[in-house]
Amino acid sequence: MAHKKAGGSTRNGRDSEAKRLGVKRFGGEAVLAGSIIVRQRGTKFHAGTNVGCGKDHTLFALKDGKVKFEVKGPSNRKFISIEAE
């Protein structure tokens, strides 16, 4: 008589939903006020001129213009600014 013992249960088999983080508007791209530029965890990018920072560190445009990425300061921080048109 052939018998197959039941397989044990596993504690795996879950995964969290992707959070869609990253740069949404790139350098030189035209944006309108309120447009999201970067979604991030922490301040990988810092807010420069005409850019606001949300409570989840999302960077967004405060004025219409073009996106500009720059590296500033002794610690080489990455800043994102909007050059108003």
From Swiss-Prot:
One of its GO terms (cellular component) is cytosolic large ribosomal subunit. Transmembrane segments: none annotated. Keywords: Ribonucleoprotein, Ribosomal protein. It comes from the Bacteria. Residues 1-20 are annotated as: Disordered. One of its GO terms (molecular function) is structural constituent of ribosome. It holds the Pfam family Ribosomal_L27. GO terms for biological process: translation. The keyword Ribonucleoprotein applies. Belongs to the bacterial ribosomal protein bL27 family. PANTHER family: LARGE RIBOSOMAL SUBUNIT PROTEIN BL27M, RIBOSOMAL PROTEIN L27. This is Large ribosomal subunit protein bL27. It comes from Serratia proteamaculans (strain 568). The gene is rpmA.
